[in-house]
């Protein structure tokens, strides 16, 4: 709905009927009439369609392949939700279209996180700017999300959930979890350009203007080749 003022038409999707009902109520309360709501998983509601802009906040919580809470759990293992969105989004971008995606990825032994995220993107056709804004250790990550669902990590339930989660991380050599943004731009059939960076300082300014400048600079440099 935040995109309604910045676009001629908007298609908003969600897997959960209740979420769409809340969205419809908000639209009516704010006299928004250029948004179409569709129900379905991932990109299924927009199969075969392409867009000038994609904004996605998928259920990217990193954990076991199960769904405890629809708003945050994808049912995919570890960072599979972010992987799926990054693999599918380029195929739904119109020429020069852009995607702005929130996501998480695991840091595993013997694999740089940059290589992991880059491996999910196509070898041709996208300019990608990946910004990692935070990294936490497994213990902090698990306790944060347990508290998110009002479970005290010190309770019996909390201890059991913590051990299952941490054991799963250990079994997959996960030593940290990163979080941030992935911004994509369609560049036709040109070789993909992927830049992964880390924000090591507090960032409070709007990121939109910075992303706009990044893609503008990248296009200028591409034209110099």
Give the location of each predicted region.
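Structured loops at beta-to-helix junctions and adjacent beta-edge loops in soluble globular domains
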Residues: 133, 185-187, 199
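Core SAM-dependent methyltransferase catalytic element
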Residues: 126, 148-152, 174-190
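S-adenosylmethionine
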Residues: 15-156, 160-161
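A general structural signal for short secondary-structure junctions and capping/turn motifs
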Residues: 121, 171-176
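Acidic, low-complexity/disordered tracts enriched in E/D and polar residues
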Residues: 189-225
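Conserved SAM-binding motif I beta-strand of class I
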Residues: 9-14
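Glycine-rich, charged/polar anion/phosphate-binding loops
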Residues: 162-171, 197, 201-202
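Conserved SAM-binding loop of SAM-dependent methyltransferases across substrates and taxa
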Residues: 1-7
